[in-house]
Amino acid sequence: MSLVHINILMAFIMSLTGLLMYRSHLMSALLCLEGMMLSLFVLATLTILNSHFTLANMMPIILLVFAACEAAIGLALLVMISNTYGTDYVQNLNLLQC
């Protein structure tokens, strides 16, 4: 395993740790999720380039599409919570149930 792969895995682990530690605010949780998705994208791209597996060239692009959709939904939820309650605490998500 090369040093680049180890650094990317460490970035993923740091983002996961940040998600587990700072989960009280929705904005920090969304930032940690974006860090995880970015490290997964770079790791998938490097793995496909190193293995020369041409059939999976679209996988990083599909991962980016899902990351963009996740970010859009997360930001819409953040705006809705902050407009309704004035804060971005994750505990307010339980109050949005119908």
From Swiss-Prot:
Coiled coil: none annotated. One of its GO terms (molecular function) is NADH dehydrogenase (ubiquinone) activity. It comes from the Eukaryota. One of its GO terms (cellular component) is mitochondrial inner membrane. The keyword Translocase applies. Keywords: Electron transport, Membrane, Mitochondrion, Mitochondrion inner membrane, NAD, Respiratory chain, Translocase, Transmembrane, Transmembrane helix, Transport, Ubiquinone. Pfam families: Oxidored_q2. Its EC number is 7.1.1.2. It is found in: Mitochondrion inner membrane. It catalyses: a ubiquinone + NADH + 5 H(+)(in) = a ubiquinol + NAD(+) + 4 H(+)(out). InterPro entries: NADH_UbQ_OxRdtase_chain4L/K, NUOK/Mnh_C1-like. The keyword Membrane applies. The chain crosses the membrane at residues 1-21, 29-49, 61-81. It is a multi-pass membrane protein. Belongs to the complex I subunit 4L family. Core subunit of the mitochondrial membrane respiratory chain NADH dehydrogenase (Complex I) which catalyzes electron transfer from NADH through the respiratory chain, using ubiquinone as an electron acceptor. Part of the enzyme membrane arm which is embedded in the lipid bilayer and involved in proton translocation. Core subunit of respiratory chain NADH dehydrogenase (Complex I) which is composed of 45 different subunits. This is NADH-ubiquinone oxidoreductase chain 4L. It comes from Delphinapterus leucas (Beluga whale). The lineage of its organism: Eukaryota, Metazoa, Chordata, Craniata, Vertebrata.
